[in-house]
Amino acid sequence: MASVVLRNPSSKRLVPFSSQIYSRCGASVTSSYSISHSIGGDDLSSSTFGTSSFWRSMATFTRNKPHVNVGTIGHVDHGKTTLTAAITKVLAEEGKAKAIAFDEIDKAPEEKKRGITIATAHVEYETAKRHYAHVDCPGHADYVKNMITGAAQMDGGILVVSGPDGPMPQTKEHILLARQVGVPSLVCFLNKVDVVDDPELLELVEMELRELLSFYKFPGDDIPIIRGSALSALQGTNDEIGRQAILKLMDAVDEYIPDPVRVLDKPFLMPIEDVFSIQGRGTVATGRIEQGVIKVGEEVEILGLREGGVPLKSTVTGVEMFKKILDNGQAGDNVGLLLRGLKREDIQRGMVIAKPGSCKTYKKFEAEIYVLTKDEGGRHTAFFSNYRPQFYLRTADITGKVELPENVKMVMPGDNVTAVFELIMPVPLETGQRFALREGGRTVGAGVVSKVMT
C-alpha cells in the first residue's frame, strides 16, 4: 500500500514522517474504492448492461480538464457525507455536477440502519479548473480498512471537522492514515459552525486542528480551513455559511491541491479493486490506473495471487468511467475494463492488470521499514522474527512473515530496520514500491521494497 519512510540520500538511515517524503517520492501508491458507484453497481445485474449495445449507448467521456481524485475524511458524524452531497448540489446549480442526494451516497442497508458510511462511495463533479472524482470515506472505527482503500487513491483530501466537537479520535487516525498512504495535500472544512454560539470556540478548534496537522507533518499553518455548514448548503439556508462556504471550499481545493503528475510513459498497470460479470459480454475489472495508457483492443496480462505465478491473458474490449465510454484510460483514471474470455471467478481484488511482459510476481523481497510508535498509533511492544502481519500492497491484503537479520534480535516501535519478507502468495513487486503493515485493526509499520528476490 504505502509508506511513510524515505531513504536519506546522504545516509543509510530511513527518515520517518519527513516533510520531504511526498515531494520526493510522489503519491504513486494505488488502491481503489468500491467502484460500483462509478460503474453503476445497480446496473450490473440489469439486462441493459448485459446487452451488446450497452457500451455503445453510453455517452463518451470528454477529457478537456485535468482529472483529480479527492475525498472527504474525518470522524464519524462530523458531516463528511453531508458535505459530499452539498458539493454536488451547489455545483449542480452551476451546471458542473449532477446533484447526488445524501441517501444515494449512504446507500448500503447497514449504513442506513447504523447511520454511518461503510463502503467508500464515489461521485464526480467539475469546477472551472478541473474534473474531480470524489471518494466519501467512512469515519467509523470499525471500517478504517475501507478508509485506507479510499484514501490511497486520493491526490488530495478534504478533512471534515465538526465545529462543536473539534478533532476526535478518528480525526487523528485519518490524518495519520492520509500521511501513511501518501495523500499529498489536505484542505479542511470546519463544519456545523451554525450551532457554535461562541466564535472564540471556533478559534480554539482551528488552533487545535492546525497543531494536530503539524504533528503528523502536514503544513498545519498553511492549510486552508474553510468554515461553514454542509447542512445549510444542502437545505439552501443561510447562504453565507452554506452555498458560499462550499464555493469557497472548492476554490481552496482548486488552488491548494496541486495538479497531480500522471505517469503516462511507463507500461500500463492497474491494480484490481473489484470484479463484475456481465452476461453475454464478459468480465469487468475496476480500479484506478497506476501508470500508462490502455486502449480498446490491446492485450493484457492479469498477475498476482496465483500459485506458480503464471499470468492470465486477455484483451480489453471496453474502457468505461462514470458510465461514459473512453477510447483509452490513462494513469489516474478510475475505470472499468471489459476483459474478453475471462470468468468472474478467474480474477479477484489484489491482482494487477498489466501490459504483457512488463511485470513479474514475487513472494520474497527485502525492504526497509519504519515501525510506528505507540503515539503514532502503532504497536506498544517489540516484534521478532516470524512475526506475521497483514501486508497491504496496492489493493492486495495478504499475510506474510518477517525474517529479521541475524544481528537484529527484535524490533521496537520507532525503529528503522532492513528485513526480508515472505508472502503466502506471489504478487507483482518492484524496487521502490511502498506498502503498509497492519495487525489487529491498526497500521503498525510502513516500508519500501529495496530488492525483489523470488
From Swiss-Prot:
Stretch forming the transit peptide: 1-51
Broad class of the protein's primary localization: mitochondrion
Protein name as it appears in the record: Elongation factor Tu, mitochondrial
Record carries keyword Nucleotide-binding: yes
Keyword GTP-binding in record: yes
Domain tr-type G stretches: 65-261
Similarity comment: family membership: Belongs to the TRAFAC class translation factor GTPase superfamily. Classic translation factor GTPase family. EF-Tu/EF-1A subfamily.
Organism in which the protein naturally occurs: Arabidopsis thaliana (Mouse-ear cress)
